[in-house]
């Protein structure tokens, strides 16, 4: 009987794996250094040999992981809905906070975008539209890519395509931190001000003792009139990245007259009850509207 249950479990696991999207190109190094944290996978819709608008996806890991671009979680929650709607997807790795402190992570993201623009034809990509999305720490880096679009001081020097632009055309931020310095003011199950918090580890010191570094890592710092449209999605009972992070960010975007929308999910926690089909469809519609 135990063997029968095991075989059924194994078969179901294989069926689920078969349902997940498969990258057309895997482990492309966008920095030319053979490091796993500088690789990406590119997925194409099953729609022939035409070129496709692109969305980058960034996994959430509290900035602690450097090789989760192919996780089942990101495939199900972000990659599959985008592919189903005709978008190509580049799922990227980046340096973790143990590999290097900020701004290394956003430098990696921008290097990946420049690589895509430089090599779009080879990978059937229409680089006239590049969107970006991610959840949690991946939402933070997606938001950073958006608010620092056209900001030369945040480019870094990763890779060999520095002559290409790294701006993005639209951002979907799934519950990403946007202002580290106020995270403990609005409810959380962790102490973000602690020296061992993910945010403190990212900048290399306790955030309240390193306020300049914290502000430099905050997407909200860089909002300006060149900031692209934003769709922000956040659960209202998120106790890891408090809901106030997105609410405050939305207010700042409004003040700068940046096109934006906040979807607040009443029963949404940190990822739980957030990636609903209807919310994934909102993401897709947002990218479609901005890629026309």
What are these regions (language model features)?
Residues 18-50, 101:
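N-terminal cap/lid segment of alpha/beta-hydrolase-fold proteins
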Residues 33, 154, 182-222, 228:
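Mobile cap/lid helix-loop segments that gate and shape the active-site cleft of serine hydrolases
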Residues 51-62:
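Short beta-strand element of the alpha/beta-hydrolase
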Residues 69-90:
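Short amphipathic alpha-helix adjacent to the substrate-entry channel of hydrolases
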Residues 100-121:
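Alpha/beta-hydrolase active-site loop
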Residues 114-187:
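Primarily recognizes the serine-hydrolase "nucleophile elbow" in alpha/beta-hydrolase
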Residues 231-234, 238:
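Short beta-strand/loop motif that positions the catalytic acidic residue
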Residues 268-277:
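Catalytic histidine-centered segment of alpha/beta-hydrolase-like enzymes
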């Amino acid at each position: 009987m135990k063997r029968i249950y095991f075989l059924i479990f194994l078969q179901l696991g294989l069926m689920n794996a078969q349902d997940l999207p498969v990258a057309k190109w895997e482990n492309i190094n966008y920095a030319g250094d053979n490091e796993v944290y500088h690789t990406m996978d590119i997925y194409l819709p099953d729609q022939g040999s035409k070129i496709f608008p692109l969305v980058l996806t960034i996994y959430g890991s509290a900035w602690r992981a450097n090789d989760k671009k192919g996780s089942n979680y990101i495939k199900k929650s972000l990659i599959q809905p985008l592919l189903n709607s005709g978008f190509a997807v580049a799922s990227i790795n980046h340096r973790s906070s143990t590999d290097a402190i900020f701004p290394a992570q956003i430098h990696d993201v921008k290097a990946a975008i420049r690589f895509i623009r430089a090599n779009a034809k080879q990978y059937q990509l229409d680089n006239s539209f590049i969107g970006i999305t991610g959840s949690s720490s991946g939402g933070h880096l997606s938001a950073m890519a958006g608010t620092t679009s056209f900001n030369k001081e945040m480019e870094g020097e990763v890779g060999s395509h520095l002559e290409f632009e790294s701006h993005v055309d639209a951002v979907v931020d799934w519950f990403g931190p946007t202002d580290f310095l106020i995270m403990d003011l609005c409810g959380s199950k962790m102490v973000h001000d602690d020296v061992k918090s993910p945010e403190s580890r990212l900048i290399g010191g306790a955030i309240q003792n390193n306020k300049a570094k914290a502000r430099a890592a905050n997407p909200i710092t860089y909002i300006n009139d060149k900031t692209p449209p934003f769709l922000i999605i956040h659960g209202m009972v998120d106790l890891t990245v408090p809901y106030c992070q997105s609410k405050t960010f939305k207010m700042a975007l409004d003040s700068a007259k940046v096109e934006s929308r906040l979807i607040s999910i009443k029963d949404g926690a940190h990822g739980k009850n957030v990636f609903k089909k209807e919310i994934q469809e909102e993401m897709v519609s947002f990218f479609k509207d901005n890629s026309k």
